[in-house]
Amino acid sequence: MEEPRHSKRPRFLAPNQASGGPPTEPGCSGVDREDPVDPVQPAKPTAYVKPMRREPPARAQPAPPAGRGQRGGGSWRAGRGRGSGAGLLRALGERVGPGMYLVHLNDHGELGYQGQLEARQTPAFSFTEAALMPGIVQEGPGPHAAQPEVGLQEPPPAPGPVAVARQTMLAPSPSLSFRPPGGSSTLCIVQTSNSTIVQSVPVFPAHSAH
């Protein structure tokens, strides 16, 4: 009787069989198989985009309005002031401060020139200058020397627009009066908040007896 031949091929045992553990299932090798490697996937496509800069459309500046000509026949030059009529104010009026212009109006409420202004304020001057005027105050003692009289006096009435402006004053204004020697009138100088008024007041015989 022949003995069964043993295969000469080396037989690999699983670790659990070598240590006496239960045999592994058929078809399963003792070596742990690695996870199947996924095929190399193509990378995501890269898009090269050129950035475009969007600029707002430029505003079209309106043409300057055509105005009346100046006295010399020229055209008005549009200014760069805040308002639309800044150039007109700069051309018509006189500058009284930063960004401020004094514009004269005629009787109809229209823009006029400085020559059309009927009443203008007289420049104010101090009483010291009035006292140094020649022919009014005489130096040296004498009974007939002009004696200044300082007091409060209402401004003399005046016709026209100046009288309307003076009606707004509520308090009397300081005044300075001079009577020249041998003269028939008294020079009154009234200082107001807006201007200085100089007026000659006639002296009647009843007042000259003082």
Swiss-Prot record:
InterPro entries hit by this protein: PRR20
Q: Where is this region: Disordered?
A: 1-82
Which ranges are annotated Gly residues under compositional bias? Answer: 69-82
Q: What Pfam families does the entry give?
A: PRR20 (PF15708)
Spell out the Basic residues composition-biased ranges: 1-11
Give the family per the record: Belongs to the PRR20 family.
* Name of the molecule in the record: Proline-rich protein 20G
Gene source species: Homo sapiens
> Gene symbol?
PRR20G
